[in-house]
């Protein structure tokens, strides 16, 4: 038999076979936006440190940067499952000496479903303007000043569920 014949044979693909016990439901493993289920960062602090290093090493223009070699490149592909605190994550990401922007990358695939606090996350990150509408922010309670000073940010957030929010002050 050829490989094509084997792959089209239903008995070689258990998922195509009828269930032996149709009353038993099979629950698939949790799926996140980024496709990861195992946390990459054991603590919020380690995650924040890695982000700061990624920015300071200018990894957005240097795929060979050290932190990119450690956690992968680009930053938008990092597994953020389990992170609960993103306060001040990209705050002030501008080089005030040269006025060069240090961060404006796509992080739309990050799993933020466990995040509770996004306070000041993009505070004075003046060039950040990436789509975030598909983020699951339903667990976030603090959005205070999240985009305050992020003068370029102009993306829709109409799909966000902010029903858990206790602070939305100065969000923009």
Language-model features: where?
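Short acidic, low-complexity intrinsically disordered linear motifs used
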Residues: 12, 16-20
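Negatively charged
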Residues: 1-8, 20, 24-172
């Amino acid at each position: 038999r050829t490989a094509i014949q084997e792959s089209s044979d239903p008995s070689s693909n258990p998922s195509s076979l009828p269930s032996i016990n149709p009353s038993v439901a099979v629950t698939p493993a949790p799926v996140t936006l980024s496709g990861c289920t195992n946390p990459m960062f054991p603590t919020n602090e380690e995650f924040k440190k890695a982000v700061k290093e990624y920015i300071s090493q200018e990894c957005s223009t240097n795929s060979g940067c050290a932190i990119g070699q450690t956690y992968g490149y680009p930053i938008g592909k990092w597994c953020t499952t389990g992170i609960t605190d993103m306060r001040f994550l990209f705050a002030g990401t501008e080089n005030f000496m040269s006025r060069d922007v240090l961060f404006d990358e796509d992080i739309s695939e990050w799993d933020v479903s466990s995040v509770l606090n996004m306070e000041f996350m993009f505070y004075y990150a003046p060039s950040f303007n990436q789509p975030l509408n598909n983020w699951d922010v339903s667990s976030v309670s603090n959005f205070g000043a999240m985009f305050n000073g992020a003068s370029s940010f102009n993306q829709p957030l109409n799909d966000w569920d902010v029903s858990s929010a206790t602070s939305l002050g100065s969000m923009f």
